[in-house]
Amino acid sequence: MGKKPADRVLADTEAKAFLASIRTSPRKLNLVAESIRGLKADVALNALTFSKRRIAVEVRKVLQSAIANAENNHQLDVDRLYVAEAFVGKAMVMKRWKARARGRVGRIEKPFSNLTVIVRERAEAAGE
């Protein structure tokens, strides 16, 4: 318990998107989040489009939202955006029961996850 940590204040060159209660385990979601960390925004969108993982569709939507936030709310250049941070957190776990042999029950856990994506604008190169 205790006090919740204060939200990190975004820099002027950053934009954020958050999705709560995604119906997958944090471990599975983190595999997809790891794959886009540090990539340019358009390359990351392309990678998620052709990913075979089911949850990549949801991650793609969050990334598109972060890019739209950067463009519309912070007036950042979309061509210079990259995925600065993509991190996963645990959400609730639904517990269900499954009938088993001899009158017993088996516990089924259905985990949920939270996803935060932060995109940042790269500084212009000196030669440009």
From Swiss-Prot:
One of its GO terms (cellular component) is cytosolic large ribosomal subunit. Keywords: Ribonucleoprotein, Ribosomal protein, RNA-binding, rRNA-binding. GO terms for molecular function: rRNA binding; structural constituent of ribosome. Pfam families: Ribosomal_L22. InterPro entries: Ribosomal_uL22 (IPR001063), Ribosomal_uL22_bac/chlpt-type (IPR005727), Ribosomal_uL22_bac/org-type (IPR047867), Ribosomal_uL22_CS (IPR018260), Ribosomal_uL22_sf (IPR036394). GO terms for biological process: translation. HAMAP family: Ribosomal_uL22_B. This protein binds specifically to 23S rRNA; its binding is stimulated by other ribosomal proteins, e.g. L4, L17, and L20. It is important during the early stages of 50S assembly. It makes multiple contacts with different domains of the 23S rRNA in the assembled 50S subunit and ribosome. Belongs to the universal ribosomal protein uL22 family. PANTHER family: CHLOROPLAST 50S RIBOSOMAL PROTEIN L22-RELATED, LARGE RIBOSOMAL SUBUNIT PROTEIN UL22M. Part of the 50S ribosomal subunit. This is Large ribosomal subunit protein uL22. It comes from Paramagnetospirillum magneticum (strain ATCC 700264 / AMB-1). The lineage of its organism: Bacteria, Pseudomonadati, Pseudomonadota, Alphaproteobacteria, Rhodospirillales.
